[in-house]
């Protein structure tokens, strides 16, 4: 009774092969697509870690299966932050930001798709409420607070921030929203996507 769905790390990009997790574009494989469709039979949701380059494949697949709740993990993989961090560049000024933002907006057009605000430490070891605010704002603008949920990505992100520091950033960002909108992102979005009573 505690089973809610499965999570797949399918992030892959030719732009940064060293940051790819799978050897091929699985969402293009017919067998993989058939297995994905089986999730509806078991009333299961699907978490996906992907990169912006894969948004078109994801949208094409998910549009055919509106009965399967989908959660996009780790902010839709803004891997451009990694290079920006190495150069000390401001993320909001990065040309690659628009490519990532386009992917976020494409995914948001599907009403059964939600997104998880998590995992930023993997892309920007020194991420903060200030330098990654554009990530939060883009995601909230695209999906709306009712389809944005918070995630800590612990213990992985413990390499970059303590749990309390991560929560402090979420609280600072959410502080710009109404009480109802904050409640949606803190519990409402996850409760609906994972069919929980929160």
Give a label for each model feature.
Residues 11, 77, 156:
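Short, glycine/acidic-enriched loop or turn micro-motifs at the edges of active sites
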Residues 137-138, 142-149, 158-198:
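Mid-to-C-terminal alpha-helical segments outside catalytic/metal-binding sites
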Residues 120-122, 154-157:
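Short Gly/Pro-enriched loop/turn and capping motifs at secondary-structure junctions
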Residues 6, 39, 74, 115, ...:
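Divalent metal-coordination and catalytic microenvironments
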């Amino acid at each position: 009774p505690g089973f809610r769905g499965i999570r797949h790390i399918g992030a892959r990009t030719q732009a940064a092969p060293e940051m790819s997790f799978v050897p091929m574009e699985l969402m293009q494989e017919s067998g993989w697509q058939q297995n994905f469709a089986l999730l509806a039979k078991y009333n299961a949701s699907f978490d996906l870690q992907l990169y912006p380059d894969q948004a078109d494949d994801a949208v094409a697949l998910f549009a055919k299966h509106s009965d399967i709740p989908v959660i996009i993990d780790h902010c839709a993989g803004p891997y451009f932050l990694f290079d920006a961090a190495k150069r000390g560049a401001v993320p909001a000024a990065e040309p690659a930001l628009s490519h990532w933002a386009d992917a976020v907006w494409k995914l948001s057009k599907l009403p059964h798709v939600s997104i998880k605000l998590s995992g930023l430490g993997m892309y920007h070891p020194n991420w903060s409420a200030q330098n990654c605010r554009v990530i939060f704002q883009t995601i909230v603008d695209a999906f709306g607070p009712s389809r944005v949920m918070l995630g800590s990505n612990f213990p992985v992100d413990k390499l970059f921030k303590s749990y309390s520091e991560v929560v402090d950033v979420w609280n600072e960002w959410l502080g710009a929203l109404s009480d109802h909108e904050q409640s949606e992102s803190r519990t409402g979005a996850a409760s609906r996507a994972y069919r929980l009573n929160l």
